[in-house]
From Swiss-Prot:
Species lineage: Bacteria, Thermotogati, Deinococcota, Deinococci, Deinococcales
Xref: InterPro entries: NA-bd_OB-fold, RNA-binding_domain_S1_IF1, TIF_IF1
Protein name: Translation initiation factor IF-1
One GO CC annotation: cytosol
GO molecular-function terms, A-Z: ribosome binding; rRNA binding; translation initiation factor activity
Keywords, comma-separated and alphabetical: Cytoplasm, Initiation factor, Protein biosynthesis, RNA-binding, rRNA-binding
Keyword field contains Transport: no
Main location: cytoplasm
Residues annotated as domain S1-like: 6-80
Protein family: Belongs to the IF-1 family.
Amino acid sequence: MPEQREKRKKEESDVVRAEGVVEEALPNTTFRVKLDSGHDILAYISGKMRIHYIRILPGDRVVLEISPYDTSRGRIVYRK
């Protein structure tokens, strides 16, 4: 009988958190975000933010989770 592998959730250490300002709203709930470090990132809204109808407008400060594998895209997880 083969051993069962444990399913692992994405750990917090797998993502990088960053803050930025929404510059532009694009189609399909995608946004262009300017990070505090000066980089531009394409970001989408996380599932919980969609469920709770949290609106994001240009000029809002947001917190992003960025994957270390593709640093040009991210997920918006919090609006300040």
